[in-house]
Amino acid sequence: MSDLEFPFEYREGQRKIVSGVYHTISTERQIFVQAPTGVGKTMSTIFPAVRAVGAGLGENIFYLTAKTITRTVAEEAFSILKEHGLKFKVITITAKEKLCFCDKTECNPENCLWARGHLDRVNDAVFELWTTQDSYDRDTLLEYAKKWQVCPFEMCLDLAVWVDAVICDYN
């Protein structure tokens, strides 16, 4: 990852954000970034975090977002970095209610077909996902959960333990 380069020409202020984020990670501190829409904050925070993980300054990246559009931009940022050589496994965790196949989220084997026998099948589902995919978004998780007849949310959490980056859409 040390040879991974920023995938765009730097816009005004981006290099400062990238440098600040990397320095913040390396010194185990916190940073607050405020900049106008369109500056490139997402890539300017994800890129140095990826480089920091590559330098052994962290193990995983957690990208928290409250908006669908921000989640999508984060997914796209990781995708662009992958096109430039990044070898990361990335998962997007969304709210249980948004992943649940049922009308009501009653997570128990008596009320939920997807919870019934979940533990018998989930390891195979996670193994297949892990060995065939690198990005685990909502659609991919739903597809494999249906295929294996497991709870998509619980499968998502099981898979999240192993990935390099978690995009967490908490709405």
Model-predicted regions and their roles:
Residues E28, V163-D164, Y170:
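Short, well-ordered alpha-helix to beta-strand connector turns
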Residues R15-S19, H23, S44-F47, C151-E154, ...:
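Short, contiguous clusters of charged residues that form electrostatic/catalytic patches at enzyme active sites
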Residues S2-P7, L57-V166:
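A substrate-engagement module of RecA-like helicase motors
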Residues G20-H23, T42-L57, A77-L81:
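Walker A/P-loop NTP-binding motif
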Residues T27-F47:
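Walker A/P-loop
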Residues T27-I31, A52-F62:
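Short, surface-exposed connector motifs at secondary-structure boundaries
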Residues R11-R15, V39-M43, T68-T72:
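Conserved structured core elements
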Residues M1-Q34:
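Conserved pre-motif I regulatory segment
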